[in-house]
């Protein structure tokens, strides 16, 4: 009999172990006062303060800046150089019909200063779609960054649900075990009285078994309490509540979700349409295609129009009236012209094209993997929900019947016609099926959360801004 009790208690330990682990969802917070928080409250608060989401939003700002740069490449660019310095003496003469100077480079005399301004305006006219490709890539990049915000938000929502439902699971388990502990202690007192009275209906072995069983339940209560503390602290961290803030959950118990699921194919279609990772991949592939086109455009020239103004003046120079002579320190010139800028190298451009094509293929292969992996994730969550829903009903029937057996065993023990081994067996089965029922409800809630995550519906109404 003792062997049976020990094995039963070991099974109970294994049964209760996931309670603490299930409560360890990840973390939100604020000021002072008693807060009563629902699941939706926790989700809204976390989405509002999450640093991971803020980081992703900063990524959107960076992408918008890149898009602004790409768009601005269509317009003229202006370069202005202004400089000045000492001016050397320089006197031209042409007494013999040959233009020369009284001063030479070996006879430098500085007796003045000069200033010069060179302004160049360049307007691209035709770039073989290089600028257009960069603009397309930048525009797609913004959408990729926005989808990344949705991805982070979806993960945050899942973590909040894990912590919230984990706290309820731990709370329900602890409350159940506390109530059961009272029944065990009552049976222990009855058994101890009979042993003291010398009744043949009870032995010291029965007393030791019930004491051991009570201690094991106390450990289960402590484990569930630890799980509840971890889950609540996780919610506090996710919501970024300050340590002094007291809060409790609106829901007092973990209840099954009354949801009629659609066909699994409908959920797969939804995932394909709105799942942030799919959006990222689709937009990312198009962005990479545009970058390949931009790299190919580097093979060809850029045709542009330009305007140039070059003005210089010096205190010790006279303006030259000879058309073929331009004094670099004393002149005024400018004009408009068309130009062509063509860069040549021996392998760099082709290497960049190959690199862009390889990066494009990387995303294509990643999407191929997602096309298989994400639908599997949807189907897995769907099946887990169905299984958990069935288990809720089965374990409910099981623990109710186990409870009836337990009531009968307690009554028989009180009447002196029952055995402790029967009572212990009834306790073990009742604990097993009741905790399994809690776990089935928790599994159903988490499966539904995973399904929302897998399809992208968890953040369907979430906005990037």
Predicted segments, located by residue:
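Small/polar, glycine/serine/threonine/aspartate-rich low-complexity segments that form flexible
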Residues: 25-35, 81-123, 251-261, 293, ...
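Periplasmic alpha-helical coiled-coil/stalk elements that build and connect Gram-negative outer-membrane
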Residues: 3, 37, 155-270, 384, ...
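Acidic, low-complexity, intrinsically disordered peripheral segments
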Residues: 11, 20-32, 88, 415, ...
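A glycine-/polar-enriched beta->alpha junction
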Residues: 44-54, 61-77, 111, 118-137, ...
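Amphipathic alpha-helical coiled-coil segments
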Residues: 55-70, 152, 156-177, 186, ...
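Bacterial Sec-pathway N-terminal export signals of envelope proteins
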Residues: 23-84, 89, 125, 201-207, ...
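Bacterial N-terminal signal peptides
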Residues: 7-17
């Amino acid at each position: 009999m003792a062997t049976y009790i020990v094995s039963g208690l070991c099974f109970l330990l294994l049964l209760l172990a996931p309670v603490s682990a299930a409560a360890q969802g990840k973390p939100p917070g604020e000021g002072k006062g008693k807060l009563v928080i629902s699941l939706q409250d926790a989700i809204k608060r976390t989405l509002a303060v999450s640093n991971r989401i803020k980081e992703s939003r900063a990524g959107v700002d960076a992408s918008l800046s890149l898009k602004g740069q790409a768009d601005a490449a269509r317009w003229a660019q202006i370069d202005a150089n202004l400089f000045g310095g000492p001016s050397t003496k320089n006197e031209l003469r042409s007494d013999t019909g040959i233009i020369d100077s009284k001063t030479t480079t070996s006879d430098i005399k500085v007796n003045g200063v000069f200033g010069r301004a060179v302004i160049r305006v360049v307007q691209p006219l035709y770039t073989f779609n290089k600028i257009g490709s960069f603009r397309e890539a930048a525009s797609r990049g913004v959408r990729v960054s926005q989808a990344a915000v949705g991805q982070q938000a979806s993960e945050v929502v899942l973590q909040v649900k894990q912590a919230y439902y984990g706290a309820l699971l731990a709370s329900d388990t602890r409350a159940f075990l506390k109530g059961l502990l009272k029944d065990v202690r009552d049976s222990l007192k009855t058994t101890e009285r009979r042993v003291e009275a010398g009744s043949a209906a009870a032995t010291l072995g029965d007393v030791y078994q019930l004491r051991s069983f009570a201690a094991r339940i106390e450990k289960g209560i402590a484990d569930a309490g630890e799980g509840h503390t971890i889950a609540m602290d996780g919610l506090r961290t996710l919501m970024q509540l300050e340590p002094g803030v007291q809060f409790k959950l609106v829901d007092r118990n973990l209840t099954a979700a009354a949801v009629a699921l659609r066909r699994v194919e409908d959920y797969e279609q939804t995932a394909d349409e709105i799942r942030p990772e799919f959006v990222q991949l689709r937009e990312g592939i198009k962005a990479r295609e545009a970058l390949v086109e931009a790299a190919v455009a580097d093979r060809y020239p850029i045709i542009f129009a330009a305007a140039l103004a070059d003005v210089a003046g010096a205190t010790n120079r006279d303006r030259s009236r000879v058309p073929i002579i331009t004094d670099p320190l004393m002149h005024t010139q400018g004009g408009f012209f068309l130009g062509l800028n063509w860069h040549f190298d021996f392998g760099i451009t082709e290497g960049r094209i190959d690199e862009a094509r390889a990066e494009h293929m990387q995303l294509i292969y990643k999407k191929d993997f997602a096309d298989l992996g994400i639908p599997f994730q949807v189907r897995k969550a769907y099946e887990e929900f169905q299984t958990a829903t069935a288990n809720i009903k089965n374990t409910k029937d099981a623990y109710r019947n186990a409870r009836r057996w337990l009531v009968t065993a307690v009554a028989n023990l009180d009447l002196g016609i029952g055995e402790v081994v029967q009572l212990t067996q009834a306790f073990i089965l009742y604990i097993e099926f009741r905790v399994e029922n809690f776990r089935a409800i928790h599994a159903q809630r988490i499966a539904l959360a995973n399904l929302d995550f897998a399809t992208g519906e968890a953040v369907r109404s979430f906005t990037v801004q």
